[in-house]
Amino acid sequence: MRVWGFALLLLGSSQVWAQACVIHSHGERLDVKLCQQNRNIPEKMFHDGFCEPNLPGQKVTVDYVDQCPAGAFGVCSDAHVDNMPYRQDIHYYGVASDTAYLKPFCEQKSQGQWQAP
């Protein structure tokens, strides 16, 4: 019985693991697309806070998906959220030369591991 309870708990908690949002921001000279894959952020907090960026002057679209789509030029895996015990994977799409500043930010500031798929 205990094994079934644990299995059901894992199954129920997988909802947090299968939660992501694709954020596409357009501006005058800026076009950014990224996807945040939730690791351990409470579902409502992730949906209402992390996936709703406040970017004045930008047109922002957010699409909620089960997992980040393929095609990223880089992924900051297990990125730490400042001043919180939460982690996420951040997938970057678009200009691969952005790796020059995204990789150091990922590894130093976010304490994540940079992966180039």
Predicted regions span which residues?
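N-terminal hydrophobic targeting signals that begin at the initiator methionine
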Residues: 1-2
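Mitochondrial intermembrane space
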Residues: 19-117
